[in-house]
Regions:
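His-Asp-centered acyl/peptidyl-transfer active-site segments
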Residues: 4-18, 28-147, 179-180
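A non-catalytic, amphipathic alpha-helix used as a structural packing/dimerization or gating element
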Residues: 20, 80, 189-193
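The DNA-recognition helices of helix-turn-helix-type DNA-binding domains
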Residues: 23-24, 90, 205
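Generic marker of residues within folded, mature protein domains
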Residues: 26, 53, 110, 152-154, ...
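Extended, hydrophobic beta-loop-alpha segments that form or line the acyl/peptidyl-thioester binding
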Residues: 32-39, 74, 96, 151-216
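Short, charged, surface-exposed hinge/linker loops at domain edges
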Residues: 207-231
Length: 231
């Protein structure tokens, strides 16, 4: 997952996961658009905010996001997703504050928006969690001591929730779905499509178009091309 276009474009694992999800869902819906709620641990602070290194736990941040792969070849999907993800201010960390604590007009506008039917959560690297100081909490997928994560009568927030994590070097993907809308066979097929898309993207060697730089500069693609030509 760190080779091919993902590495060449400087993409993060989340970009690869998102691009593959867009391709897998698009292959079934025929739509090149992915409207998804992204969830993060919130421990990557926006610019200007303190580092959370001396704190414990997650500061869960959720926000909706659109990704458009219209006219984008598959080999460039990761770079396209990355470029669009980087355009989200502060990694979406401000959304929750505006949605629930912002001025009335901001809360009303965000509350009126359509919530994504799909969510993606990249939990990151969980290797060695059984040896961590908090191992007695038994927070590990598949652990029999883990217990229920949500009340049985709590409404499903998304029609499809995709939970992804890396455990001891192995990528684990969990599909949590609304059984009233999907049957197991449909989800099994989607999971296979998703895995196939991930493998294709991870193995792809064709260099995609360069994404925007990780800098606060206001340079577009034409400006960058002009600078490169002047050297």
């Amino acid at each position: 997952m760190t080779a091919g276009p993902a590495a060449q474009a400087g993409a993060e694992t989340e970009d690869l996961l998102l691009a593959a999800l867009a391709l897998a869902l698009g292959g079934r819906t025929g739509e090149p658009l992915l409207y998804v709620e992204l969830e993060g641990h919130g421990r990557t602070p926006p610019d200007g905010l303190p580092e959370p290194a001396r704190t414990i736990g997650w500061f869960t941040a959720r926000h909706p996001a659109w990704f458009d792969l219209t006219g984008v070849p598959e080999a460039a999907a990761v770079a396209a997703v990355r470029a669009q993800r980087l355009s989200i201010p502060n990694r979406g960390a401000d959304y929750g504050a505006l949605r629930h604590l912002g001025p009335d007009h901001a809360r009303d506008a965000l509350a009126a928006g359509r919530r994504p039917a799909v969510s993606l959560n990249w939990l990151g690297q969980l290797a060695g969690i059984e040896h961590a100081p908090f191992r007695l909490v038994s927070w590990r997928p598949g652990c029999p001591l883990r217990g229920a994560e949500r009340a049985a009568d709590l409404p499903q927030q998304h029609a499809l929730a995709v939970e992804t994590m890396l455990i001891d070097g192995c990528l684990r993907i969990e599909f949590i779905y609304d059984a009233a809308r999907f049957d197991a066979a449909t989800i099994d097929t989607l999971a296979a499509d998703y895995a196939a898309a991930l493998l294709r993207l991870a193995r792809e060697r064709a260099a995609p178009p360069a994404p925007p730089p990780d800098s606060p500069g206001e340079l577009d693609a034409d400006d960058l091309a002009a600078l490169a030509a002047s050297r």
